[in-house]
């Protein structure tokens, strides 16, 4: 009888754990609204990738992360209406991921991410915006019993927070004062 209780408890935990589905990797920011300070610029190109090794701190991510980040960023930019169609200034937006520190285990799962966002004027090469945006995604232990579920959700939250922080910083940026003047004046 004493043997049956622990075995039953272990089986119950295994069944409950097995029923939990790992959420998809989804970086889409849900609460993006139209910004009040729109830029007189049209985005022509958007790229997202990993920074060169010498710029990276901790990157524990595979090649599936940049395309998902790009898709979520494009969605957030579209919904924020921060860039204008048919504007006189055409720009490229480049994102280089310098940190993706995902938790391997733990009770409270925290993922930290960092990315360098650069907006460049296509006509003259002026660097209109360049910032390292850092963020974290924290998932408490009561979110889910299975650690893998909390870990993936912490990735999602970290990148969502990063994209939202970028849009907030970009809204405050002044494109009339380039950070760096390009060569083609």
Where are these regions (language model features)?
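Compositionally biased, intrinsically disordered linkers/stalks adjacent to structured regions
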Residues: 143-185
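Residues that form or immediately flank small-molecule/cofactor binding pockets and catalytic motifs
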Residues: 8, 53, 138
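Extracytoplasmic/secreted envelope proteins and their assembly/folding machinery
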Residues: 66, 70, 74-78, 114, ...
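A structural "domain/chain start" motif
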Residues: 18-71, 171-185
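Extended alpha-helical regions
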Residues: 1-2, 97, 110-113, 177-185
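Sec-dependent bacterial lipoprotein signal peptides
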Residues: 1-19
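Surface-exposed short loop/turn segments
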Residues: 20-28, 80-130, 137-153
